[in-house]
């Protein structure tokens, strides 16, 4: 079996298993059938995303294509990491409910919801605002043997840009250039992870 096909089958299996376990845990909250239909419709959407990802990978030609594939993976992680955490933690709530420890079961259930929500917010922040925020760290290096001509010599080091993550029309690149120019460097060096899978 080819690796790509294995990943496709494993991905679909994980999505359906995850959603099936989640549905068993929360179906008592669904008062109408439409809620169940919407739940499985959203599950089928992610199955379609995995199939699209599998078909799209061989056609990758440049960073823009890679950008959208990365977005697809990020969206899947955004939803299924919180779901998985909720399923695991809420399993203890179910066990407590079976043991007739209803107050403790409710506390654990709320804890599961809190953990799932927190992970959703953290991942959302990571794939949207935080990943594109530039951080400036200033260091002063004193070298006594350096000629006087190099006093106040400024070096700007750019690292871990991962340009393939931005997409073709990302305006933050202009912001980055302006920020570097504002620092008024004498020398600019590029180190480490300038690109992703594509140059």
What kind of feature is each model-predicted range?
Residues 1-132:
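Non-catalytic terminal accessory segments
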Residues 132-137, 142, 146-199:
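Membrane-embedded segments
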């Amino acid at each position: 079996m080819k690796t790509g096909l294995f990943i496709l089958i494993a991905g679909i299996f994980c999505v359906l298993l995850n959603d099936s376990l989640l549905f068993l845990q929360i179906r008592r909250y669904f008062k109408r059938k439409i809620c169940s239909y919407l739940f499985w419709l959203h599950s089928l959407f992610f199955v379609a995303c995995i199939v699209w990802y599998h078909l799209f990978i061989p056609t990758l030609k440049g960073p823009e294509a890679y950008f959208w594939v990365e977005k697809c993976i990020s969206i899947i992680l955004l939803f299924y990491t919180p779901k998985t955490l909720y399923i695991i933690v809420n399993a203890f709530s179910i066990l407590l409910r079976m043991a007739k420890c209803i107050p403790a079961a409710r506390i654990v259930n709320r804890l599961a919801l809190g953990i799932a929500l927190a992970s959703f917010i953290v991942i959302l922040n990571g794939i949207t605002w935080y990943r594109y925020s530039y951080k400036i760290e200033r260091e002063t290096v004193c070298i006594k043997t350096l000629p006087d001509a190099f006093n106040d010599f400024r070096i700007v080091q750019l690292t871990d840009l991962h340009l393939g993550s931005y997409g073709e029309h990302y305006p933050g690149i202009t912001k980055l250039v302006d920020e570097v120019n504002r620092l008024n460097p004498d020398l600019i060096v590029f180190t480490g992870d300038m690109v992703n899978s594509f140059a």
